[in-house]
């Protein structure tokens, strides 16, 4: 694989709307060369017969089951509120105008 040129890095920077210095262009060029070399090695691996997966672990639905549990009634929840109107908590306004 041929090394990534400064012009190619500059083109990618323009596509992503990044403004890079000359030092960054040189640095990214060498970094992209290393990254693409690793990708090339990975692409060379023979995966014939290997089942595609998004997770190497075989755990399936290991979360606990949902269970209904008793909860507060509306009246119980509002009983200790400093202020409630129409079955809802009253809180200070934090957004918009104070109209």
From Swiss-Prot:
GO biological process: glutaminyl-tRNAGln biosynthesis via transamidation; regulation of translational fidelity; translation
Pfam families attached to this UniProt entry: GatC
GO MF: asparaginyl-tRNA synthase (glutamine-hydrolyzing) activity; ATP binding; glutaminyl-tRNA synthase (glutamine-hydrolyzing) activity
EC number: 6.3.5.-
Catalysis performed (reactions): L-glutamyl-tRNA(Gln) + L-glutamine + ATP + H2O = L-glutaminyl-tRNA(Gln) + L-glutamate + ADP + phosphate + H(+); L-aspartyl-tRNA(Asn) + L-glutamine + ATP + H2O = L-asparaginyl-tRNA(Asn) + L-glutamate + ADP + phosphate + 2 H(+)
Top-level enzyme category: ligase
UniProt entry tagged with the keyword Nucleotide-binding: yes
Keyword terms: ATP-binding, Ligase, Nucleotide-binding, Protein biosynthesis
InterPro entries: Asp/Glu-ADT_sf_sub_c (IPR036113), GatC (IPR003837)
Keyword Disulfide bond recorded: no
Family statement: Belongs to the GatC family.
Subunit structure: Heterotrimer of A, B and C subunits.
Role: Allows the formation of correctly charged Asn-tRNA(Asn) or Gln-tRNA(Gln) through the transamidation of misacylated Asp-tRNA(Asn) or Glu-tRNA(Gln) in organisms which lack either or both of asparaginyl-tRNA or glutaminyl-tRNA synthetases. The reaction takes place in the presence of glutamine and ATP through an activated phospho-Asp-tRNA(Asn) or phospho-Glu-tRNA(Gln).
HAMAP family registered for this protein in UniProt: GatC
Name of protein: Glutamyl-tRNA(Gln) amidotransferase subunit C
Taxonomic lineage of the native organism: Bacteria, Bacillati, Actinomycetota, Actinomycetes, Mycobacteriales
Gene name per UniProt: gatC
């Amino acid at each position: 694989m041929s090394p990534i040129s400064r012009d190619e890095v500059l083109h990618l920077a323009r596509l992503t709307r990044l403004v890079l210095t000359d030092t960054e262009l040189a640095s990214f060029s060498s970094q992209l060369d290393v990254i693409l070399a690793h990708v090339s090695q990975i692409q060379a691996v023979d995966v014939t017969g290997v089942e595609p997966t998004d997770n190497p672990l075989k755990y399936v639905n290991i979360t606990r089951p949902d269970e209904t549990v008793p909860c507060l009634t509306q009246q119980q929840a509002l009983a200790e509120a400093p202020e409630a109107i129409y079955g809802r908590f009253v809180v200070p306004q934090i957004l918009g105008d104070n109209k």
